[in-house]
UniProtKB/Swiss-Prot annotation:
UniProt keyword annotations, A-Z: Disulfide bond, Glycoprotein, Plant defense, Secreted, Signal
Main location: secreted
Xref: SUPFAM superfamilies: (Trans)glycosidases
Limits of the GH18 domain: 30-290
Protein name (record): Xylanase inhibitor protein 2
Organism annotation: Oryza sativa subsp. japonica (Rice)
GO cellular component: extracellular region
Name of the gene encoding the protein in the UniProt record: Chib3H-h
Complex and partners: Binds to fungal GH10 xylanases.
Induction summary: Induced by wounding and methyl jasmonate in roots.
Subcellular location: Secreted
Spans traversing the lipid bilayer: none
BP-aspect Gene Ontology terms: carbohydrate metabolic process; defense response to fungus
């Protein structure tokens, strides 16, 4: 049973609007984000966007950086096809982000200069920049809408420098945000790896992972509300696993509504749900209506 379908007896039309807001989303719509790129069997990026479920897809992961080497790992998906799919998703009003970091990989920012180099590579390889000698893995005419910081290992140094530099590229866009910055944090507040970066105030969204942390399993609503209170200027999302196969913190749809959504959805900076990940959402139909 899908997430929307399961909530209808309890929240009727309100839950439908909350969890199944179809793209394109306005600034005031609750969002439904999904992480894509961890399993080749999850289907293409285009397929995910064509479900009509998601307002944002987050490509995972740009997972090697900071030492003069840059690498993308999207589990064997063909890069050329992803570029075409990015443009297709954007044509449907769906935001496409590239997540940096993740579990595993080889990344850190040992110096301010390394942060500058990573910002330059992200800008010219994946965002709106172009520079001779810098390859664009998704093609010359495909650009993601922003960068998600999913920093799950190493130290905290210089991610604030990276965030400021990426935000600085918005000067090249007139009247709009060309480089959207988001962060995927651990549930316990604060997340020490991202604390300094978030203090810059340049992150439009924060996706709080309500899994992988015993404290959050015990008191998920309280843990999430600490984040919402700390960052009133950012949209704060509830990060969920789509299947009990992934983590014991998986929340049955009814429990999600009664334990969290009925209380937090009225908060002005509630952003929506962030589902990890597309493979398990497709397999379990967690956000579907069937």
């Amino acid at each position: 049973m899908g997430l929307v379908h399961a909530l209808l007896p309890f929240a009727a039309a309100a839950a439908l609007l909350l969890l199944a807001a179809p793209p394109p989303a306005t600034a005031d719509d609750p969002g439904l984000a999904v992480y894509w790129g961890r399993h080749k069997e999850e289907g293409s990026l285009r397929e995910a966007c064509d479900t009509g479920r998601y307002t944002t897809v987050i490509i995972t992961f740009y997972n090697a950086f900071g030492h003069g080497r840059y690498s993308l790992d999207i589990s064997g998906h063909p890069l050329a096809a992803v570029g075409a799919d990015i443009k297709h998703c954007q044509s449907r009003g769906i935001t496409v982000l590239l997540s940096i970091g993740g579990q595993g990989g080889a990344y850190s920012l040992p110096t301010n200069a390394s942060a500058a180099d990573v910002a330059d590579n992200l800008w010219n390889a994946y965002l709106g920049g172009h520079r001779a000698g810098v390859a664009r893995p998704f093609g010359d005419d495909a650009a993601v809408d922003g960068i998600d910081f999913f920093i799950d290992q190493g130290g905290a140094d210089h991610y604030d420098d990276l965030a400021r530099r990426l935000d600085g590229y918005n000067k090249y866009y007139r009247g709009r945000v060309g480089v959207l910055l988001t962060a995927t944090t651990r549930c316990s507040y604060p997340d020490h790896r991202l604390e300094k970066a978030l203090a810059t105030g340049v992150f439009a969204r924060i996706h709080v992972r309500m899994f992988g942390d015993e404290q959050c399993t015990m008191s998920p609503r309280y843990s999430w509300e600490k984040w919402a209170a700390a960052f009133p200027g950012s949209k704060v999302y509830i990060g969920l696993v789509a299947s009990p196969e992934q983590d014991s913190a998986w929340m049955f749809q009814k429990d999600l509504y009664y334990e969290m959504l009925q209380f937090v959805r009225s908060l002005p900076n509630y952003g929506g749900l962030a589902i990890y990940d597309r493979y398990f959402d497709k397999k379990a139909n967690y956000t579907g209506e069937g």
